[in-house]
Amino acid sequence: MKSIGPFLPLFFLLLSCTVQDPLGTAAAPENTSWNKSIPLAGNAWVLDDLLASSSLIQENGLANWSEAGHSIGVFFHLSGTGKMQMALRARVQSGESVLNYTFGGQTGEISLHNTDWAIIPIGAFDVSLPGYQRLELQGKTRTGPYFAEVEAVLLGGAAAKGEAHYVKDEFYWGRRGPSVHLWYPQADRIAQVEWFYNEITVPEGQDVLGSYFMANGFNEGYFGFQVNSDTERRILFSVWSPYQTDNPNEIPENQKIKLLKKGQDVYTGEFGNEGSGGQSYLRYPWRAGVTYRFLLRGHPAAGNTTDYTAWFYAPEAGQWRLIASWRRPKTNTYLAGLYSFLENFIPETGATSRYARYSNQWARDTGGQWHELTRAHFTADDTARKGNRLDYTGGMQNGAFFLRNCGFFNERTEIDTDFERPATGKQPVIDLNGLP
């Protein structure tokens, strides 16, 4: 978790201050009481170049902003409507800058020439609908090296007095956006689940950079596919070590995940930061609009260990591919805690929505019987539960489960909601003994 930094106390000092500031060209009522302070460090993105956010949106807010072509979007969610005053806490390094702003279809200009932090009124607006709001800033002219440094957007008036949701802390996680999950409770009532089968379809246009569409999750790991860059995609299978640490170098030898075998062209190694363990991935150019199949096996092995093996089926290849087989020490179990998730792992793309369909889930017991999993329990992570981000949803559509997150949409599914899809009866037809 990143530190929220020493600047936050400044935000809270502003929440009830009275402002009469002559520096802004847009008018705000005298004696405005600023009820909310939205830190740009957790709530702003460079809309025209999302990856530029990593250099322009810093721990203290917007900085190093020199290109006029960049459009800065600041997002926040309001439950109230009515009149709202808006201002920036901002400064310039030198000279004078003029910024263009857009909010709710209203546009205008702001002038800055203060080199100390000051409150720059933008103006008064009518908020007609509750939900996510977006303030957009663009640089127009500047005589100094940068357009402005902006620490926060301040809100006052009737619309700002109600409940507001925005990223207040843990900016790294808030910028990544909320992670959402589908748990399959029917599997918990099946004795000794050895195999878990799932299918995922990512519609065209939803394969957003930074997405991890996780198909086959279990208590000790997860298996799915990712969009890692504009040119690279991966099929990822990871198993956590029983030793609790975020640093794989700290894991004792007798608690390390051991590789048993791996598929052709599969990378294997260790991972950290969100637990630690064994990681394997295949670089594979999977495509949006195509349904891919995932198969996982988990069963006890000798010496209080458990073996986990993952296979991936791409219809364009027409065959199952081995990703890897891992042995986990100090573990004696079959598969349990079966679930799927959708997460964004790149903070710079946390303002872009992504969606996937999860369909035809099955679990196979040690007696050889397949069980269709037609029920799912929807949950979300702390970013969602704390109300830092509300752009998450999931459920059942057109016969399949789905997950969607990020992008500041207003549709939202209540956490801990149960869903049921129609049974397909399409039991997996797989020669389990013939798998690579």
Region roles according to the model:
Residues 2-10:
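Sec-dependent signal peptide recognition
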Residues 15-16:
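C-terminal motif of bacterial Sec signal peptides marking the signal peptidase cleavage site
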Residues 23-285, 293-436:
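Extracytoplasmic
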